[in-house]
Amino acid sequence: MSETLSVAVTDPIVQVKNLAFYYGASKALHNISQDFPRNKVTALIGPSGCGKSTLLRCLNRMNDLVDGARVEGSILLDGTEVNTPAMDVIELRRRVGMVFQKSNPFPKSIYENVIYGLRIAGVRDKAVLDQAVEQSLRSAALWDEVKDRLHESALGMSGGQMQRLCIARAIAVNPEVVLMDEPCSALDPKSTARVEELISELREKYTIIIVTHNMQQAARVSDYTAFLFEGVLVEYGVTEDLFVKPRNKQTEDYITGRFG
């Protein structure tokens, strides 16, 4: 197995070291080592089944929910090991939020969707909750569209609005990292453009790690890009460099459409 072509990252917030992941006896990730820089957007690209979503879900231990899952290696969040019994998984998922491929608002009001995580954390002060709702919806570029119907069902929103609501819900608990798993795959081009603009704005406050099949999207929104193939991190670098002058032939073949 060839060595990963990788770039040095300054001020990493997440550090992955020799990470291997198994679904039962099947090895899905092979000794991944990768640093994710703070307040940047990192895209994970590669063909279906390459392990990019598995890697993403390792970062906040969503894979704990999978029967037979097993992790080896280390994941550090600001220097603290994630894969240890001492780690409070609920607190980890507050610090490392998740936006899924399919928008998944709860069958509750828009307001209740945004404050869901805060309620779990024990926040009851209405003034604090009201402020969090407005700030999060403004950050998600949604406030002006929904401010007059906060107590209506979130299920009446458009697909693009629902996905931005899910982003608002993720950032309402003030995470350090936001994971996004194909957040635009079910959206029309106009809604996709809104979410991409939002990702660019959110990098000022949060570290964003996004899985995408859309290489043009990766090129547009990310600062760094990692290419995975068959569970191996093949190449990782500054996005412009990786797309314009990839150092690995396999990377070049993928981004030029020779396979995928």
From Swiss-Prot:
All copies of domain ABC transporter, residue ranges: 14-255
InterPro entries, alphabetized: AAA+_ATPase (IPR003593), ABC_transporter-like_ATP-bd (IPR003439), ABC_transporter-like_CS (IPR017871), P-loop_NTPase (IPR027417), PstB-like (IPR005670)
Keyword Transmembrane helix: no
Segment forming the signal sequence: none
Chain sites annotated for binding ATP: 46-53
One BP annotation, GO: phosphate ion transmembrane transport
SMART domains, per database record: AAA
Top-rank EC class of the record's enzyme: translocase
Alphabetized CDD domains for the sequence: ABC_PstB_phosphate_transporter (cd03260)
PROSITE patterns attached to this UniProt entry: ABC_TRANSPORTER_1, ABC_TRANSPORTER_2, PSTB
Family: Belongs to the ABC transporter superfamily. Phosphate importer (TC 3.A.1.7) family.
Name of this protein: Phosphate import ATP-binding protein PstB
Native organism: Syntrophotalea carbinolica (strain DSM 2380 / NBRC 103641 / GraBd1) (Pelobacter carbinolicus)
The gene coding this protein: pstB
